A protein has these predicted regions:
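N-terminal hydrophobic membrane-entry segments
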Residues: 1-173, 177-179, 192
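Peptidyl-prolyl cis-trans isomerase
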Residues: 186-189
Length: 196
């Protein structure tokens, strides 16, 4: 077994051992490695070895609704590690699918408690909350969630246009204030020049 991998061995259909990296001996036809579902290159595959290194799941964009009923799309990355191979095989049937569904529903719940402005400015808060909830929920599956990163938060086009108009209005306001302050300073200097 290669370094950083392990295998679950069943003897006559029952759990027998968790094999560690290196040379291991099993009895042919009586012992066999348990097949598990894993995700490789964005696809579910069956394999009989469990990767103990940190893994990254890049989830597809999903639609979420904020507290103020604005629909937006969010893309998330999840960094996790299998710390208990036995639990990851026998406590959950399809680990990658379960992690994906749990991440999606938890993300929807967290975003549903926030308004649009909070969502756009609180990535770190969302990441921290999401990681804490996922780590707690996946602990019984033998998983340690190390990090969660929101890659992209995309509000609807109408909201983006409104934000652009608001930024343009803010820039125009600042330009008007600077122009009027310049005129005021010009008048003050002219009046001082006339007095002198």
């Amino acid at each position: 077994i290669p370094q950083s991998e392990t295998k679950i061995i069943e003897r006559l259909g029952r759990y027998f051992a968790t094999l560690k990296p290196g040379i291991n001996v099993i009895i042919p036809f009586i012992d066999h490695a348990k097949d598990i579902v894993s995700m490789r290159n964005g696809r579910y595959v069956y394999t009989n070895s469990i990767d103990l290194r940190e893994q990254v799941y890049d989830f597809d964009r999903q639609n979420v609704i904020t507290k103020d009923n604005i629909q937006m799309q969010i893309n998330a990355l999840l960094y996790f590690q299998i710390v208990d191979p036995f639990k990851s095989v026998y406590e959950i049937n399809n680990l990658p699918n379960a992690i994906e569904k749990l991440t999606q529903t938890t993300l929807r719940n967290i975003i549903g408690e926030m308004e649009l402005d909070q969502t756009l400015t609180s990535r770190d808060t969302i990441n921290t909350k999401l990681r804490a909830v996922l780590d707690d929920a996946t602990n019984k599956w033998g998983i340690k969630v190390n990090r969660v990163e929101l890659q992209d938060i995309t509000p609807p086009e109408s909201v983006l246009q409104a934000m652009e108009k608001q930024m343009q209005a803010e820039r125009n306001k600042r330009a008007t204030i600077l122009t009027s302050e310049g005129e005021k300073e010009k008048q003050r200097l002219l009046s001082e020049g006339e007095k002198a």
